[in-house]
Amino acid sequence: MKEKIQGDKELMINRYRRVAGLLLTVGMLLLALPLQAQKQPKEFTKWPTGSSPPEIGRRVAERLLEIPHSNFGRPGPPPFITYPEVATWYGALTFAQLSGDKDLDARLIKRFQPIFAEESNLIPVPDHVDRSVFGAVPLEIYIQTKEQKYLDLGKNSADKQWEDPTPDGLSSQTRYWIDDMYMIIILQLQAYRATGDSKYLDRAALEMTTYLDKLQQPNGLFYHAPDVPFYWGRGDGWVAAGMAEMLRSLPENHPRRAQIMESYRKMMKSLLQHQGKDGVWRQLIDHPDSWPETSSTGMFTFAMITGVKNGWLDKKTYAKAARKGWLGLITYLEPNADLRNVCQGTGKKNDLQYYLDRQRLTGDLHGQAPILWCASAFLR
């Protein structure tokens, strides 16, 4: 009897030790997390029925899998994978991973397999920012799977982009269009995230600070081009998203971080002043009478979510704006998960009416992509 009692005591002691060890481990992990990562802002919880980021993200990712490769809305297959599809595919992959949906992730990766075989003609020649950015997708798949063929394909695009740099160390693809502040940045960041090689990070940071010096206006916003004095929504959206992605990966002690952070906060402050009462930004940011545009709204919302979650922005102010942006954005979502009010592809033109008269598309991937970025950012 004494032996049984002694055995029971030892069993209980061992159980207590295991529980205590588990609690200690959990506590240490929580301490290792940034404070802002331990508690979601209340604005990022308790979503109205059908509006939560996991629900919306899954719908939009599934929609990508339903459609053929995009050709900028033109009939027939594209000559190569286009940059709006790259942005959407990247967002879908990050969403699938962050939401823990292994089946969705597997199907998104499977969608890529023909590109190594019968669809190899769709691999863009990496000789222009809009084509080079393709590499971000195989690099994301490599980050998730560690399969070498994805690294080789994606890294080739990143390396080609700096094959013949300028005397200042910039990519020869530099052209000072604000779109580049996402296109160049995300490719080089993905190469850094995949390899850990800081040369890719330094390239992205140099490129971004050079663009900031040249293009950011005193109010924190960006003209579509230096000779086109209009704050076109999606153009600025690419910048906002690019800075948010840059700051996610840039170490605190990086010499270019302070400048990028200052420019980012300056832009966010200005955007806050121009957000519509419905949560949606306008086709021309500072023209409240211009039409509500959804791709820019998604991009600005992504940048604000990322800033709040990482503690770069005042939580009380910007969490409210980000929630408002998300809920305003998804009111434009069709039952099949196509987004309405997406500005068509737009080249620069020094003509106000030109921007106001741009077509409003439904289901264009320029709009689908930032929904997935937002859903991913909420889950990080």
Where are these regions (language model features)?
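Asp-box/WD-like beta-propeller blade repeats and closely related beta-sheet repeat scaffolds
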Residues: 151-182
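N-terminal secretory signal peptides that target proteins for export/translocation
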Residues: 1-17
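Helix-capping and short linker residues that terminate individual alpha-solenoid repeat units
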Residues: 69, 100, 116-121, 146, ...
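Bacterial N-terminal signal peptides
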Residues: 21-32
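Boundary at the C-terminal end of the N-terminal hydrophobic targeting segment
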Residues: 35-37
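Aromatic-lined, polymer-binding surfaces characteristic
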Residues: 81-92, 124-142, 176-188, 232-247
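Extended ligand-binding clefts on enzyme/binding-domain cores
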Residues: 178-179, 189-284, 290-301, 313-347, ...
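CBM-like carbohydrate-recognition segments
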Residues: 39-86, 95-107, 111-114, 118, ...
